[in-house]
Amino acid sequence: MAETEWTPEALSGRYEEIKSCIPQQLEAYARFLREAAPEDLRRWQQIAQDLKLELNLENGRIKYKKEFKPLELPVDICYIRHGKTQGNTEPRVFQGQVDYANNQLTQQGQQQAAAAATKLEAMAAAKEFIPDLLLSSPLLRAVHTAQPFVDANPKPLFRVLPELAEMAFGEWDNRKVAELEKDDPAHLFYLQQNAVIKAKGPHRICCQLWQSPEWLEGKKELPAENFLECLDRQRKALIKVGEIAKELCGPSCGERKPRVAVYGHSMAGAAVSVLLGFGKEDQLGFLGFDGNYIMPNATPTILIPNAKP
């Protein structure tokens, strides 16, 4: 079956049509909540409570509570989202924990990766951020974004950490946003920054086309997670980053914190930003994580809470 060819005009019209269906999407979200298992609702509320976030289940949005404090880590973090891929080029897809051909760096993405390496080298030369350790998501778009810096700078250790993988969109993964039903509550994820909505079914892996099978460890499918669950997973990932850095770099760093450059993704990066107190808020104080709120491609971003400007 031939793929739909989207002209810019047709795509713009489709997105406007989707936006006009927010009331129907909200009705679908209300059904999603009614059908959710009670233990899932409790778990999502517990995640928010543990992270000192205010969760409005009715609209799926989150805010910082007054008592929120950034996650305390024994490391300093510089986060680099991967370079551009076909998957985040219009007509874009939900690009989560997938690693197929369309999820790899484009030529522009490769150029961005090289530019990110140059930028990080300049930051090191200026003593703004000198990495002791480089950690990457196992998805190749992140690994290949790290590669130019790794190749030119052999001194910092480089490791792949599976826990840094992107948010898993389940059955939405690698589906074109424009081709989901216009009343699908999936659209609330990016239209209204809904941190609760998630796909019902998993992503079924096509092993023959998967580009990095070694980290799958035999998995045949990847369950969906919502942004709250991604936050919780990235919290655990950051704690592990601290443990790895202490083990590998602690003796050479002395009294100072090890500095870690993390190569990752848009939603995972947004989660890390929220956890470290750099979450982006709208006019009502709700946290955003997709669309206009995401990190730019291949741009080193220092995320050190309470750091002096």
Curated annotation (Swiss-Prot):
It catalyses: D-mannitol 1-phosphate + H2O = D-mannitol + phosphate. GO terms for biological process: mannitol biosynthetic process; negative regulation of glycolytic process; regulation of pentose-phosphate shunt. It is an enzyme of class 3 (hydrolase). InterPro entries: His_Pase_superF_clade-1 (IPR013078), His_PPase_superfam (IPR029033), Phosphoglycerate_Mutase (IPR051695). The active site is at residues 82, 166. PANTHER family: FRUCTOSE-2,6-BISPHOSPHATASE TIGAR. This is Mannitol-1-phosphatase.
